[in-house]
Amino acid sequence: MSELTSQIERRRTFAIISPPDAGKTTLTEKFLLYGGAIQSAGSVKGKQSDKHAVSDWMDIEKQRGISITSSVLQFEYDGYCINILDTPGHQDFSEDTYRTLMAADSAVMVIDAAKGIEPQTRKLFKVCAMRDIPIFTFINKLDREARDPFDLLDELEREFGINTYPMNWPIGCGQKFRGDYDRDKRQILFFDNAHRGRELIHGVECEITDTEKLDELIGPYQREELVEQVELIDGASADFDLEAIRHGKLSPVFFGSALNNFGIEPFLEHFLKMTTSPLPRVAEGKEINPFDENFTAFVFKIQANMNKAHRDRIAFMRICSGKFERGKDYYHVQGNKAFRLSQPQQMMADERAVIDEAYAGDIIGVFDPGIFSIGDTICEKGEKVRFEGIPTFAPEHFAMVEQVDSMKRKQFAKGMNQIAQEGAIQIFFEPNSGLERVIVGVVGVLQFEVLEHRLKSEYGCDLRRTNLGYSQIRWIENEGLDPKTLKLSHDTKWVQDFRGKNLLIFTSEWAIRWVMEDNPNLKLAEFSRDEQKED
C-alpha cells in the first residue's frame, strides 16, 4: 500500500451538530481529551470561568460561553487522523453552519435527552440529508433527568423519516443513571460519577446474564427493567445495516454523558469502524476519487481576523483528493491563475501550525489576500477541475444597516464585505440605491449582534440597524426577466445580491403564494448555487 493510500484511508472528517446547550462543545472537548490533543477539558460556560472551550475563539464567544463560528480541530486517535468541524449550536447560528456541513463526510447529531429534537436540529438534518451522508446520534446528559429513550427514538424516526439503531441502551437516568448496555458486545458499561469529567474513565464491564453481579451494581429492580427493555429493543428496532448507515438511511444511536466522559470511548470506537475514509466529490458531473494523486480542494469557509495578532483573512479548504505539499504551485480555477501556498496552516480553533503536507479529508487554512470566494476550486496546474458550487441558503431575518459616522464609509464597506464573504451574513441592495444603506439577511438573529460587535471591535465602525418585517426570500430563476414587470404586493420587495442576481423578499408564505398566483410564469428558488465565472 502506498503512503498516499494509507494516509487517506485513516482520515475521518465529520461535523458535530446540535441545538443550543445539548452539550456539543463538551462532547468535542472530550473527543480531544481522549485523543490526547488536550490534557483537561475546559469550562464551556465562559461567564463563570477563565477557562474557555478550545473550539471557542472569538471574543464574543468567550464572553457568552457559546460557539458562534465554526471551528476546525484535528487530532489522532487509535491510528486514525480525525478532523472535526465544530459548528455553532447556540440558538441563532449562521449560514456558515450549513456551508461547513458541505465539507464533512459524516455528521454527529447531539441531542439533549431531556429536550429531544429542536428546531435547529431539523434545519441541520435537512442539509445532511441533502448530501446523503451518514448521521450518528449521541443522546447526551443521561446523568440528568431525561425523557423515555423509546420516546426519543420514536421522535427521531418520525421527524426525520429515518430508521434508528440503538448501539447501546441506558440504565436509568439522572441520579438513577447506572450505565449503558452495549448491544454489540452484549455487556454493561457501569457508570461511576466520581470523576466528574476531568479525567478519562473506564467503566466496569458486566454480562447482562450475570444476575448476581448486576444486582450488586444496579439492584434487582433496574436489572429486571433493563432485561425487559433490551428484549423489546432487540425485537422492535431495525436491523443493523452498514450500507444504510453510510447512505444516511439508518442512524446509529448512542446514549451517554459527555460531561462525565461516559460513553465517549465506545462511541468513538464504533464511529470509526462504521465510517469510511474521505468520500468522492462531484466535479462537472464526474466523481473525483479521493485516492487520485492529483490534488483538488474547495473553499468552504472564509474567516477574517481570527487572531488579533495577525489581523488577516483565512480561507479554509477541504482537500478532496491527493496530497497537498507546501511551497508547490497550484491553480485557482475561478481566478484563472497559478499561485503558491507557502504558509498553509492547520487549526486548533485560533491556534495555528504551519504544515508541510496534508491529504484528502484534511482541512487546511491559507492566507487569503482577497482572491478567494466560498465554493472556489483549487487544483494542480494544468488541470481544470470545478467542484459543484456551495448552495446559498435562505436567510430568515432582515434589517436595514447603515454606518453612524459618514466618515467611516470605507471601514463600513470593507467590514460588511469581509463578514459577508465569511458566510455569516448576506448583503442585499435595493436597485438604484447607494451603498451607504444595505439590507442584511441572516439565518439567526444573533448574527446581527455579532455583526455590530465585529464592525466596532475589528473595523472601528458603529452601526445603525432597523429591523425589517421580512422573513422569506426567493431567488428569481427566470433568465432575462425584468423584475419591474412583476405584479408585487405591498409586503414584497425586489432586491439584488452582490452578484447582481434578482431576489424577492416577503413577509410571509402567504405573500409568496400571492405573487406566484399573480405571476404564473415566475420561477422562484429557495437557495442559490454559486455560479462564479472564470475571469
Model-assigned labels for residue ranges:
Residues M1-D535:
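Structural and coupling elements of P-loop NTPases
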